[in-house]
Amino acid sequence: MKQLGKHIILELWGCENQALDDQPGIEKMLVDAVKACGATLICVKTHKFSPQGVTGVAVLSESHISIHTWPELGYAAMDVFTCGEHVAPHDTIPEIQKFLKPEKIDVMDIKRGIIEVDEVKE
């Protein structure tokens, strides 16, 4: 069996409200998370909502990292989807924790593109 991608979904509760509404801080957190997991950054795009909330994505050569925040609830939803053997999506978690300071994190692991090795054409 071969796995084409690793996908973790993060549910972050009890985050610092100011961090969840800090667009430049979220951009930096995304860049730091990309470096931590060993991925290759293509670009980062974020959007600040009114009256509050930020959404953002780091586009990677290996896929993406995304975030959507609800400061009024102290909540953020994140996806870290990577392809390739050299990228470690779980290594993003300490960078995310350092910035958002969640009280609780739920992590869901999804194996993407499970195929039989003999199905892979060289």
UniProtKB/Swiss-Prot annotation:
Cofactor: pyruvate
Keyword hit for Nucleus: no
UniProt catalytic activity: S-adenosyl-L-methionine + H(+) = S-adenosyl 3-(methylsulfanyl)propylamine + CO2
GO biological process, one term: spermidine biosynthetic process
GO CC, alphabetical: cytosol
Residues annotated as site: Cleavage (non-hydrolytic): E62, S63
Sorted UniProt keywords: Autocatalytic cleavage, Decarboxylase, Lyase, Polyamine biosynthesis, Pyruvate, S-adenosyl-L-methionine, Schiff base, Spermidine biosynthesis, Zymogen
Gene3D superfamilies xref list: 3.30.160.750, S-adenosylmethionine decarboxylase domain
PTM (free text): Is synthesized initially as an inactive proenzyme. Formation of the active enzyme involves a self-maturation process in which the active site pyruvoyl group is generated from an internal serine residue via an autocatalytic post-translational modification. Two non-identical subunits are generated from the proenzyme in this reaction, and the pyruvate is formed at the N-terminus of the alpha chain, which is derived from the carboxyl end of the proenzyme.
Cofactor binding, note field: Binds 1 pyruvoyl group covalently per subunit.
EC number in record: 4.1.1.50
InterPro entries documented for this protein: AdoMetDC_C, AdoMetDC_fam_prok, AdoMetDC_N, S-AdoMet_deCO2ase_core, S-AdoMet_deCOase_pro-enz
Pathway terms, separated by semicolons: Amine and polyamine biosynthesis; S-adenosylmethioninamine biosynthesis; S-adenosylmethioninamine from S-adenosyl-L-methionine: step 1/1
GO molecular function: adenosylmethionine decarboxylase activity
Residues bearing PTM Pyruvic acid (Ser): S63
Active site: S63 (schiff-base intermediate with substrate), H68 (proton acceptor), C83 (proton donor)
Domain of life from the UniProt record: Archaea
Purpose: Catalyzes the decarboxylation of S-adenosylmethionine to S-adenosylmethioninamine (dcAdoMet), the propylamine donor required for the synthesis of the polyamines spermine and spermidine from the diamine putrescine.
Family listed: Belongs to the prokaryotic AdoMetDC family. Type 1 subfamily.
Record note on quaternary structure: Heterotetramer of two alpha and two beta chains arranged as a dimer of alpha/beta heterodimers.
Name of the protein: S-adenosylmethionine decarboxylase proenzyme
Lineage per the UniProt record: Archaea, Methanobacteriati, Methanobacteriota, Methanomada group, Methanococci
Gene: speH
